[in-house]
Amino acid sequence: MRCLIFLCSGLLLSSHLFACTSAVISGRATRDGRPILWKQRDTGTLENKLVYHTGHTGHTGSTYAFLGVHNADDSANAEMFMGSNAVGFSIINTASYNLAYPQYKGKMDEEGILMKRALAVCSTLAEFEALLQATKGTRGVEANFGVVDAKGGAAFYETDPYSFIKYDANDPTVAPHGYLLRTNFSASGTPERGQGYIRYQTETDLFQWGFLGEGLSVNFILNEATTCLRHSLTGVDLARGPLPESAATPSIVSFADFIVRYSTTASMIIQGVAQGEPASLTTLWTVLGSPLTTPVLPVWVQYAEQIPPQLFAGHNRSAALNAASLRLKDRCFPLKVPEGKSYLDFGKVMNREGTGTLQKLRVVNALLVKEGTRLLEKMRSAKVTDPDVRQSYQEMMNAVGGYYASFGVDL
């Protein structure tokens, strides 16, 4: 009964307000021993861009180079919402809505500012904890911060303006299976408040199945979690139900409180490094748009200059890849009234002809992961050059362009 109350309380709250889904996975829980950090980002700002920040050394101190996702309209690149730096420190967040800090009267929603600062100056979990101590009483955040580092560290930090509580994914008493999940409430917060209880239950069921089955991996999260079409409260699984005949078959379905939904603007699966590997091998498997309409691309801080320009953007513009994703996504949500965001034309996503956006996406994603993994293995053996990276990206972008061209969308 208590679980049902949790689920219903989440259902009654807004579905689209900074409602992210995430996971911190220690190396002891993954198939290859490398930690994974995942964030499915939901926000009202649909346009995204990838941004590379160069490091520097000066009289006021040094900063690391780092790479991650910003809102497209962030002309000053002041807020980063998920990313990694040159020494393998990676960070994500989900907003929390059940922490208490009544004495704080300052500005809130500064999570992106704090994460950008952390990427610039932190190399380990311990240094992030020192940053949290240094910003006590001045940081306007209410969030679950997920962090991994190149030393095998993996943890969530439930954080308000004054305090934080660490949940260590390497501690068997905290994470018996080696992984931790968060949506939009904190375990240390007020029970039955917050948001995302339905998504949390869906995620819990999904990860338990994955952990006991094929194992937790980049492929598992990409194929099973980012595009999960199961609803844990109603029991609906759109992918397993009767599919519409074709993309042209009218097939409007209710689409609220799924892990992926209208407000999902990006997803990032950050694959850390094994013990003894260079931190530069940390890989950001990046979905720069809706997971229903956006192919995944691997990016690395050390090869930032080789990343295709379609992932970056000019002044106050979304990246070209993100813009193409949004144009295709627009067809999947044909109702343009405000409540239309909760109704999906499912035939556009999956159908019996196999022409849905997700069906074609799974084919191209398999090719992209294969090529990205091949390139990563060359990096691990120190046998890769800048021309190799450029050639690999060219092949990947040809596949991405072909995906959008099949729907008549220009990239």
Please identify what each model-predicted range represents.
Residues 1-4:
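Positively charged n-region of N-terminal signal peptides that target proteins for export
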Residues 6-7, 17-18:
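Cleavable N-terminal signal peptides
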Residues 21-77, 82-83, 89, 93-120, ...:
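C-terminal, well-structured catalytic/ligand-binding subdomain of enzymes
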Residues 82-84, 137-138:
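Short, charge-rich binding segments
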Residues 110-143:
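Intrinsically disordered, low-complexity linker/loop segments enriched in Gly/Pro
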